[in-house]
Amino acid sequence: MSYELIAAKRVDLGTGASRRLRRAGKLPAVVYGAGKDAVSLELDHNTLYHAVKHADFHTSVLELVIDGQKEQVKVAAFQMHPYKQQVLHIDFARV
């Protein structure tokens, strides 16, 4: 199964900005690696929450569309809330 995720670059960074994103149904994320600078992103939470449940999501090469530009990435790490059904943050590594 192939995954295509739509993301947008984040302007506001930090704890408060991340909390505001989560309240708005978004998910803070970062993509890094391949000799390029790290880019802070925001994604739709529900899309990622349902994708994280599938084992192949964690091992597949994903297509991440950042403001119209496509990048090949893999999931490097993600954080779940201790008791809520909520993804808190996800890291992607460029392939």
Swiss-Prot record:
Keywords assigned: Ribonucleoprotein, Ribosomal protein, RNA-binding, rRNA-binding
GO molecular function, one term: structural constituent of ribosome
GO biological process, one term: translation
An annotated GO cellular component: cytosolic large ribosomal subunit
A Pfam family annotated for this UniProt entry: Ribosomal_L25p
Superkingdom as given in the UniProt entry: Bacteria
Family indicated by similarity: Belongs to the bacterial ribosomal protein bL25 family.
Protein task: This is one of the proteins that binds to the 5S RNA in the ribosome where it forms part of the central protuberance.
Subunit structure: Part of the 50S ribosomal subunit; part of the 5S rRNA/L5/L18/L25 subcomplex. Contacts the 5S rRNA. Binds to the 5S rRNA independently of L5 and L18.
Protein's recorded name: Large ribosomal subunit protein bL25
Name of the gene encoding the protein in the UniProt record: rplY
